[in-house]
Amino acid sequence: MGRGKKMSKPGDGRSGDVPDTGRTGGTNENHPKINGEVAHLGQPKIYSFMSPTKSPSARPPLQEENSVAHHESKCPGKPLTETRKKAEVEKKRISSGTELSVKPSEQRETECNSIGEFLDPKQEQTDVRRNIALPPADKLNHQKMVKDKPLRRKAQRKKSPNRKLTDYYPVRRSCRKSKTELESEEKKRIDELIQTGKEEGMKMDMITGKGRGVIATRDFQRGEFVVEYHGDLIEITDAKRREATYAQDSNTGCYMYYFQYLNKTYCIDATRETGRLGRLINHSKSGNCHTKLHNINNVPHLILVASRDINVGEELLYDYGDRRKSSLEAHPWLKN
């Protein structure tokens, strides 16, 4: 290998060997020197990115000492006295910075509260939205409102004076009658007609093929009292004896009507001639009247009631109810 340029020997770290850069005074923290005099005493920028809330100068002194010692070991060219002085100055600066940066917990709480005051309107809006989004709370409030409304209405009703019906309509006697009242009045009317013997709305007339009969002289409504089948009220033993006597005379007709009352058989004997029209009403299976018992003072009376509406001029008829062979042979008109 040929001879060339001589390689410069590395410096021994002395101050005289280092060329002057044109700056006077100590080294600047923001502009460190290039030739091995970098002290690296500045704040590492990585801490600001890792924890933004912490101040860069809030590092503990022990960490600073370790970093200083580490940098000192990397810079063997600097004398130890200068590095120690710079380390002490840096410690003082860091301690003063930590005192300023570290705030008491009370101040932090006050700052948080002040920040919260600025954020209160937004939080209130979010709270309102949350309340709107929750249907159960709205339902409960709605139910409370609904419950309050009837109470208010009841209070208003209680305050209003009570009005009587007589304040609007005059007092008058009611003309309406109950069913029992109507029935009792009808019974009294029939009792009076039976006891007095009045027979109104009919007359006796001659009917072809039958002889005497009764014709209606007025209209009768269904269920209305027509006439009483008047005669002698006798028991069955007396009725049988009289019937045997009447059978001996062919000119005497049979006007005897048998019925049961209180589990006992009775008979109305209307054979004797009287002026009562009930005994002259003729027989028919499809008559417009029917018989009915009427009690007056526990004494049964046999009356005729209209089975349907009867017009003026119609003959009054009812079914005798005798279906015996002897009766049918003696009186063939009973078949009709």
UniProtKB/Swiss-Prot annotation:
Which ranges are annotated Basic and acidic residues under compositional bias? 67-93
GO terms (BP aspect): cell division; methylation
SET domain ranges (all copies)? 200-321
The family line of this record is: Belongs to the class V-like SAM-binding methyltransferase superfamily. Histone-lysine methyltransferase family. PR/SET subfamily.
Give yes or no: UniProt keyword Ion transport.
Answer: no
Keyword flag Transcription: yes
- List the PANTHER family hit by this protein, alphabetically: N-LYSINE METHYLTRANSFERASE KMT5A
Q: Where does S-adenosyl-L-methionine bind?
A: K210, G211, R212, Y255, N282, H283
Role description: Protein-lysine N-methyltransferase that monomethylates both histones and non-histone proteins. Specifically monomethylates 'Lys-20' of histone H4 (H4K20me1). H4K20me1 is enriched during mitosis and represents a specific tag for epigenetic transcriptional repression. Mainly functions in euchromatin regions, thereby playing a central role in the silencing of euchromatic genes. Required for cell proliferation, probably by contributing to the maintenance of proper higher-order structure of DNA during mitosis. Involved in chromosome condensation and proper cytokinesis.
Catalyzed reactions: L-lysyl(20)-[histone H4] + S-adenosyl-L-methionine = N(6)-methyl-L-lysyl(20)-[histone H4] + S-adenosyl-L-homocysteine + H(+); L-lysyl-[protein] + S-adenosyl-L-methionine = N(6)-methyl-L-lysyl-[protein] + S-adenosyl-L-homocysteine + H(+)
Record the organism: Xenopus tropicalis
Among InterPro entries, the record links this protein to:
KMT5A, KMT5A-like, KMT5A-like_SET, SET_dom, SET_dom_sf
Q: Which domain of life is it from?
A: Eukaryota
Q: Name the top EC class.
A: transferase
Keywords of the record, alphabetical order, are: Cell cycle, Cell division, Chromatin regulator, Chromosome, Methyltransferase, Mitosis, Nucleus, Repressor, S-adenosyl-L-methionine, Transcription, Transcription regulation, Transferase
Q: Disordered: where is this region?
A: 1-112
A GO CC term assigned to this protein in UniProt:
chromosome
Return the protein name.
N-lysine methyltransferase KMT5A
Q: State the compartments where it is located.
A: Nucleus; Chromosome
